[in-house]
Amino acid sequence: MLSSKDEFIKHMVIEVQNTTVVSASGEAKKLGQYSENVILIVNVASYCGNTAQYKDLQKLHDIYSKKGLRILAFPCNDFGNQEPDSLTEIKNFCSTKYGVEFEIMEKVHAKGNTTEPYTTLNNVEPKGDVEWNFEKFLIGKDSNVIARFKPSIQPFDENLIAAIEVALDS
């Protein structure tokens, strides 16, 4: 059992760092492999009212990837059956419609019987399942979750941009 807040924080950093995710090509990766980068994790869907966020996520990638931002998009069909397509179809849709160049990962479950990275992320404060498609988790270079942003928060929301810039400068 952990006895102090400091131990708990260290424990959570280790858990997030050691969280295994799977790329669209089937390659298992630990989030810690992205250390020295700031990561924005987003659960995505092709048939959602928030799908247009892909465009601004790509703009974020264009602006901040050279500074160390990595965007990891996890297709998710948990909300209204809004991502029923195969990974090949999803990647094709993202690249042709929105010019997406950031990483598309394997499909996941972000609520209920979750799969990684959401089994871990949903336990970080504020605890609970992802509410809908395009919820965002910002992870710092130290593999610690910095912030969680609701699906309604657009990629160029001033609070999200400020958090990204502070994380990149740390």
What are these regions (language model features)?
Residues 2-32, 52:
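N-terminal "domain-start" segment that seeds a small globular fold
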Residues 30-32, 62-63, 126-130:
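Surface-exposed acidic, glycine-flexible loop patches that form ligand/cofactor-binding
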Residues 37-38, 46-47, 51-75, 95-98:
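Conserved helix-turn-beta segment immediately C-terminal to the redox Cys motif
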Residues 48-51, 79-82, 155:
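Acidic-and-aromatic substrate-binding clefts and catalytic sites of carbohydrate-active enzymes
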Residues 56-59, 85, 89, 116, ...:
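Extracytoplasmic/secreted proteins, especially bacterial periplasmic and envelope-associated proteins
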Residues 68-85, 101-112:
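Thiol-based oxidoreductase modules, predominantly thioredoxin-like and allied folds used
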Residues 88-133:
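Short, internal strand/loop/helix patches
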Residues 116-170:
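Thiol-/selenol-based redox modules, centered on thioredoxin-like
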